[in-house]
Amino acid sequence: MVRRTGVTLLVVALVVVALVSSVSAQLNFSPGWGKRAAAGSGSSGGVGEAVSALHHSVGGAPGGVVPPGSSSSSGDSCGPIPVSAVMHIYRLIRNEAVRLVQCQDEEYLG
């Protein structure tokens, strides 16, 4: 009887291990809650302003970049994108790339 219980527990444990090893999970974090959402509501000069600049350009602001082949009959509701918003995003990406390179250099040299 004791041996049969041990074998049953071993089989159950192996099944559980097999199931756990085949399961994968994905955790999704949204920035719309918590401390960051409250801090991001102000004007910080970050990505939020670039996005709002894109949103305000839908009416056809001067200096906007119009995608090729776009017309009123194409069904696109995006509108022109201001060059200043594109340049702001470019500068953000470039600055982060410089920071990453500096961190890598410090890690390898340190």
From Swiss-Prot:
It is found in: Secreted. GO terms for molecular function: hormone activity; pigment binding. The keyword Secreted applies. The modification Pyrrolidone carboxylic acid is found at residue 26. GO terms for cellular component: extracellular region. Keywords: Amidation, Cleavage on pair of basic residues, Hormone, Pigment, Pyrrolidone carboxylic acid, Secreted, Signal. Residues 1-25 form the signal peptide. Belongs to the AKH/HRTH/RPCH family. This is Red pigment-concentrating prohormone. It comes from Carcinus maenas (Common shore crab).
